[in-house]
Regions:
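Active-site-proximal binding-pocket segments
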Residues: 124-125, 151, 155, 159, ...
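Contiguous, non-catalytic segments that form substrate-binding/exosite surfaces or channel walls
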Residues: 1-106, 329
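All-alpha helical catalytic cores of prenyl diphosphate-utilizing isoprenoid enzymes
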Residues: 31, 56-59, 63-80, 89-91, ...
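Active-site recognition of the HExxH zinc-binding catalytic motif
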Residues: 108-128, 145-149
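Post-HExxH zinc-binding segment in Zn-dependent metallohydrolases
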Residues: 137-178
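C-terminal, non-catalytic "cap/extension" segments appended to globular domains
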Residues: 210, 214-352
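Secondary-structure capping and boundary motifs in well-ordered enzyme cores
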Residues: 23, 55, 89, 93, ...
Length: 352
């Protein structure tokens, strides 16, 4: 390995620029035009979601309810508060997550909680005999991200999940959500929007934020982009892919800490994790009706499958080996594209 491949391999063992090129070229060709169709066809969200204040204490109460749904064992976990949500652990008996509560954005804390509990559940389910060894944790950045995004997006934004849990949310926010129906909530939590900030991006546009960063990183290594032109190229790509005019560096090239902390090659794992999640969903659905399981009282059936096929191995095998054994095939990004297109064409009433 040499050049950019060295850094890519550091964050996701076995990945190279050639492999990522195939992945991101598919995202560019398939999702850029599709996203433009979705943005033009979306219905407006219910005014309650933008007009109401959602008290932090009520949000915390619902996130505590979600701990039970996610099997986030209170004897082994804790949930605190921080400026930016994160997960930390000391083995499979001490997993800690944090959250942040914005009173003008109901969905933010809900999906941060589910996301971080997805990370945490992975660590909780690593086999006991791997604890206190070098293999006693998640196998890779992308595989870890696949677990958090699987629960956040594939499960947590599904109709089946909220058919079960929306009544609880509505009971906690009885005044704020008066007159709001399940379909209104589903449109709200799945709304796509072209935005400047990667960490605030929705499920559909998120991979384009990562695509832009990948293309810039690769360009700096192959000599097609000079460092002094990074901001200009960044702004051009946001205009090309998302139709946005970046107003300043804060909403542009300096928004992430990764490059300034030396973490070059990290960004692609975020999109790869989402793509892994889509293929895991398809594999799981071959073994049992995963959509029915999403609507159960808790995620027990789903978590048991993930433990048996992914979690229990920790990092005792290569990421690709664990993934391919779990899904029964090599990684195929078409599952991700098909998942997004199918979901958003249904939501927006458009043809693919």
């Amino acid at each position: 390995l040499k050049g950019y491949d060295v850094l890519l391999d550091e964050y996701e063992r076995g990945m190279t620029a050639d492999k990522y090129d195939e992945f991101f070229n598919l995202i560019k060709s398939e999702l850029v035009p599709f996203i433009k169709k979705v943005l033009a066809a979306q219905k407006p969200v219910h005014p309650a979601f933008t007009a109401c204040t959602f008290p932090a204490e009520k949000q915390k109460a619902f996130c505590e309810y979600l701990r039970g749904v996610m099997l986030f064992d209170k004897d082994k976990t804790m949930m605190g508060e921080s400026e930016h949500p994160y997960t930390n652990n000391n083995g499979n008996c001490d997993v800690r997550i944090t959250n942040h509560y914005y009173e003008n954005a109901l969905a933010s804390a809900i999906f941060s909680a589910i996301h971080e509990m997805g990370h945490g559940l992975y660590e909780l389910q690593v086999a006991g005999d791997l604890q206190d060894t070098m293999s006693g944790g998640g196998v890779s950045m992308a595989m870890h991200e696949s677990q958090s995004r699987f629960f956040e997006n594939n499960v947590g934004r599904s109709r089946e999940f909220w058919q079960r849990h929306f009544p609880v949310l509505k009971s906690i926010f009885a005044e704020e959500l008066e007159g709001v129906e399940l379909d209104d909530f589903l449109l709200y939590i799945n709304r796509a929007e072209a935005g400047f900030i990667r960490t605030e991006a929705d499920e559909l546009t998120y991979p384009l934020h990562v695509l832009i960063r990948y293309e810039i990183e690769k360009g700096m290594f192959d000599g097609t982009i000079d460092e002094e032109n990074v901001e200009r190229v960044w702004n051009e790509k946001y205009k090309e892919y998302l139709g946005l005019d970046v107003p300043d560096a804060g909403k542009g090239v300096v928004q992430d800490m990764h490059w300034y902390g030396g973490s070059i090659g990290y960004f692609p794992t975020y999109a790869l994790g989402s793509a892994y999640a889509a293929q895991i969903l398809a594999a799981m659905n071959r073994d049992f009706d995963v959509y029915s399981a999403m609507g159960e009282e808790n995620v027990g059936k789903i978590a048991a499958w993930l433990k048996e096929h992914i979690h229990k191995y920790g990092s005792s095998k290569a990421p690709s080996e664990i993934f391919e054994n779990a899904v029964g095939a090599p990684f195929d990004p078409h599952y991700y594209i098909d998942y997004l297109k199918s979901k958003y064409s249904r939501l927006c009433g458009i043809t693919i």
